[in-house]
Amino acid sequence: MNICLGIITSPHGIKGAVKIKTFTEKPENIFLYGELISGSENYKISLVSVVSNNLVIATISGVNSRNEAELLRNKKLYIERNKLPQLNDEDEFYQNDLVNMEVRLESNELYGYVKSVHNFGSGDILEILVISTKKNIMLSFTKEIFPYINMKERYIVINMPEFIGQ
């Protein structure tokens, strides 16, 4: 299984550098894992600078012009799961681990499933497919709203009585 560590958002300058939105804890961590994978291609990336808490400017081996960099726009960059560090704390997990987990009410009743995890800049958001309505909702991924995660049995508990009609 591959884990997405970032996405190339746009070229930067005329010499082939790119901007990469990172999904790592620290933006510079995307450079710790060697070559990254996108489809059948491998990319060796090097840090130019950290722009913000989730954006870096990087060069890619073999990409030497803005036109070449433009062809990489929106490419997702992956790493093999087994290359990521083992997590020791039960409160630690990779965002990708949440996808397809059951979402249960505090009464243990099935509420829905996690479709994906997003971050638009202000924190993580879970996209949940609600079973009863067959619609997707997005909720801030906070300890108050999701007080318990059971990684072994693959479910999370939602605590929002005013939102879910309890």
From Swiss-Prot:
A GO molecular function held by the record: ribosome binding
Q: Does the keyword Cytoplasm apply?
A: yes
Q: What is known of its domains?
A: The PRC barrel domain binds ribosomal protein uS19.
Under the heading InterPro entries, the entry gives: PRC-brl_dom, PRC_barrel-like_sf, RimM, RimM_N, RimM_N_sf, Transl_B-barrel_sf
Q: Which domain of life is it from?
A: Bacteria
Q: Enumerate the subcellular locations listed in this protein's record, separating them with semicolons.
A: Cytoplasm
User: What keywords would UniProt list here?
Assistant: Chaperone, Cytoplasm, Ribosome biogenesis, rRNA processing
What protein is this chain from?
Answer: Ribosome maturation factor RimM
Assembly:
Binds ribosomal protein uS19.
Q: Which Pfam family, just one, is annotated for this protein? A: PRC
Q: Where is the PRC barrel domain?
A: 90-164
Q: Which family does it belong to?
A: Belongs to the RimM family.
Please state the gene responsible for encoding this protein: rimM
Recorded GO cellular component terms are: cytoplasm; ribosome
Instruction: Summarize the protein's role.
Output: An accessory protein needed during the final step in the assembly of 30S ribosomal subunit, possibly for assembly of the head region. Essential for efficient processing of 16S rRNA. May be needed both before and after RbfA during the maturation of 16S rRNA. It has affinity for free ribosomal 30S subunits but not for 70S ribosomes.
Biological processes per GO annotation: ribosomal small subunit biogenesis; rRNA processing
